[in-house]
Amino acid sequence: MSREDFSDTLRVLVATDCHLGYMEKDEIRRHDSFKAFEEICSIAEEKQVDFLLLGGDLFHENKPSRTTLVKAIEILRRHCLNDKPVQFQVVSDQTVNFQNAFGQVNYEDPHFNVGLPVFSIHGNHDDPAGVDNLSAIDILSACNLVNYFGKMVLGGSGVGQITLYPILMKKGSTTVALYGLGNIRDERLNRMFQTPHAVQWMRPEVQEGCDVSDWFNILVLHQNRVKSNPKNAISEHFLPRFLDFIVWGHEHECLIDPQEVSGMGFHITQPGSSVATSLIDGESKPKHVLLLEIKGNQYRPTKIPLTSVRPFEYTEIVLKDESDIDPNDQNSILEHLDKVVRNLIEKASKKAVNRSEIKLPLVRIKVDYSGFMTINPQRFGQKYVGKVANPQDILIFSKASKKGRSEANIDDSERLRPEELNQQNIEALVAESNLKMEILPVNDLDVALHNFVNKDDKLAFYSCVQYNLQETRGKLAKDSDAKKFEEDDLILKVGECLEERLKDRSTRPTGSSQFLSTGLTSENLTKGSSGIANASFSDDEDTTQMSGLAPPTRGRRGSSTANTTRGRAKAPTRGRGRGKASSAMKQTTLDSSLGFRQSQRSASAAASAAFKSASTIGEDDVDSPSSEEVEPEDFNKPDSSSEDDESTKGKGRKRPATTKRGRGRGSGTSKRGRKNESSSSLNRLLSSKDDDEDEDDEDREKKLNKSQPRVTRNYGALRR
């Protein structure tokens, strides 16, 4: 190619479904995905392409591990950051194309020397999630290593509305409009394409010397292409006719040669995955990447094989078609399967390009055992440990379909994918249960369940509850003064708020929930809870189990405090926190968090009395009775019991205690009985009436003041 042709030719290397981090726990296959991605980047450097185009699923997990992220960043740094000049320009509005904090293509940043730009959309494995709608690719984008595009903001009502803005590139006389569409749930995107004006395509504006028809239009998407169920896939005929070339991700079978779609005028390439993640027939085909050279409105594809991919051999056998197998003899079945496996291993070794780096092959045999007995696949694979990479799942058994149910007679609507079928069943079960909930909408629980199971979001349900509670609080606070509500009126008001929120949700897309949070930490929890004005108190039991932020306490003091908190659970007063972090915890129940009080006077009095008695009981529960059981004259009498003297002497010494951990030292009485006595006396204190609260408070203060020397002695023994 001459220098003039090179200056007008845009060279692009296309790859999809790298699945970095796949099988990272497997000692044999843990490096396969990284070696394949390293080879792809090396090919891009060797072929001197203008940029690398990735079609989604760069990562295998929605939350990749730190090891996976570090290795991915290392590979991109080695191959993308250099002093090579970038030969093309981005002439479109970059703030629209790249929706991040910087809003520009990475090679235009003056602080970075980017020699190989990488453009990528997200797939179904690494799609954005959480309150901030971020994905793992956003991390690479923030590192200025990847240009992340194709992230759609679903707006409008019903199924939603999306607008696709192209990245306009120009190299010499060649102009390219690159459209990106990150993964959207197939059923929803299918409905959107069939809804008028739900999907809008923005075309380049007419400029001097450049008409709209002069642009070469490329689309990169990551969706189902299989025709098994039309509702769970995207048809090529949904796409606009002005497109010239389509890169189709998500399908792992390598169909790298561009195929023309009849009646549409564009070509489709399906590069497939660079690492085998499902051991099926389609994955056994050789893996390739595509070198796409564009000049004007013409393009030239060149497929390049990947040599670092682990060899994979797949075959299917029907036992009844084999004449040398006895249906009643298991040994004959084993001998035949052993022979097939050995042949596949030998076949894989012959395909090895570099003999010095022969890898253990992947072997999969699909066995139709109709009329025969099965064998244990794991026991069968034990003899091939060290010979194949997947000894635990070499065999997969199946039976022939019943008569009259051939594949030709199966309707397309009945060919549901197993994972899609199960997902529909889960949603249907939740919907059919008809839960009569007053705060949480069922749709929000569906989304939380999806993120908890599929995206490993451990705080999905907690975020769902917190978001709906805050939304309910806000609506109640806007209506009227919360303190004027009675309990019955509050329940009715909450029900009305739920109906209003359900109406609002019905006008918004189902996937636009704001409560999901995949990155909640203790700092975020503290910030979020502090924003709720005058409506929170420490809930030791619930918040400690939910977030695990309350620090452990020492001795009986912490346990007695927890007991007093449980004893006051019915009173809408402030509870005592166990540590500094407990002040940031908020109870997730509605009544307490809103701060409704049935009787403010009695509640405040009970709270002060409970606080004083709780501190006394918590510090003196080793061998002193409750404040109600002790008469005033008893405090003036000396302790004549030898048992008390011994316990007092023991407390004065700092020697190893023989009692249990966290209990009072030197006490010979039953700790459980003391604990019950203190909690029962506290309950009696809290149940006192308003008419005699003042007298009780005065008597109680006198008793507490008199018992202070005893408390001080025990407190010093417990603190050590």
UniProtKB/Swiss-Prot annotation:
Composition bias type Low complexity, residue spans: 596-615
Annotated GO MF terms: 3'-5'-DNA exonuclease activity; DNA endonuclease activity; manganese ion binding
Ranges for region Disordered: 503-720
Biased composition (Polar residues): 508-537
One Pfam short name: Mre11_DNA_bind
Cofactor: Mn(2+)
Compartments in which it is found: Nucleus; Chromosome
Active site, renumbered: H125 (proton donor)
Binding site for Mn(2+) 2: D57, N124, H250
PANTHER family noted in UniProt: DOUBLE-STRAND BREAK REPAIR PROTEIN MRE11 (PTHR10139:SF1)
Identification of the protein by name: Double-strand break repair protein MRE11
Encoding gene per record: MRE11
